[in-house]
């Protein structure tokens, strides 16, 4: 009689890497590390050796050491591009085994604008699902820097699977007279944190409805323009309020999720989260997009959220010609809707 042997099951989770390119990208991953984001690897890549030395990332790449001698790209994207080309083999060594890569950078300068598209293109060609999350300059930084940023964004849209843009100028929509300059940038960085965490949480955390990496890939691969949103609420009607907050878009440039081809909905709450609430939130998001959109919904438990309901949305494949904004919902009396500051972005 053949002896039955219990099969050995090896747990395999997708490897997700966030690479911060240039000064802006480096600051973004420093904030994510400080927030203790779990389930991802971090890489800092910069032409500026001094800035790189202050990075909190364990893995650091000096871009274009021979070209820049560690002195930066001097706000010249061509130098940033050449620096990334020089270091591309080292970059891909660090990305070995990665299934999904977030490339974050500030557009308008030299390193981020020039190097980020090179890195995104190489990662995508290697079969890595590649998502770029970048910022555009404030208006006071000048027209030339803005034009440089726009060219960088267009190059990224040719290189990455999905591109999300945060216009820094739109931070004025959610700032007040007491908002510090540092706080404003942390608001923008929080968007990246929310986007990455909502994806990793759906895959690795205990939940009512978990997703696998293939679900994420379906919504994000080759989808181009995208947006993210996160909302939180407590009290009565918290599911609907959180969904409405996730849909709201104070950081957008005349873009709506209405024309999205793919939508990833991440719903999280404490052990008091009900199936009815999950249905209510998911239904509200579904009402915001066209019927033909590919919608993937996941719901997870987070014991730290007892009493709080959170909804995160990633909408991809947005048609820029469909720019009509949905009407913002009116506030409801006696209820608390506390959306995280960096709720939504283009």
UniProtKB/Swiss-Prot annotation:
One of its GO terms (cellular component) is cytoplasm. GTP binds at residues 23-27, 110-112, 141, 145, 189. It comes from the Bacteria. It holds the Pfam family Tubulin. GO terms for biological process: division septum assembly; FtsZ-dependent cytokinesis; protein polymerization. The keyword Zinc does not apply. GO terms for molecular function: GTP binding; GTPase activity. Belongs to the FtsZ family. Essential cell division protein that forms a contractile ring structure (Z ring) at the future cell division site. The regulation of the ring assembly controls the timing and the location of cell division. One of the functions of the FtsZ ring is to recruit other cell division proteins to the septum to produce a new cell wall between the dividing cells. Binds GTP and shows GTPase activity. Homodimer. Polymerizes to form a dynamic ring structure in a strictly GTP-dependent manner. Interacts directly with several other division proteins. This is Cell division protein FtsZ 2. It comes from Rhizobium meliloti (strain 1021) (Ensifer meliloti). The lineage of its organism: Bacteria, Pseudomonadati, Pseudomonadota, Alphaproteobacteria, Hyphomicrobiales.
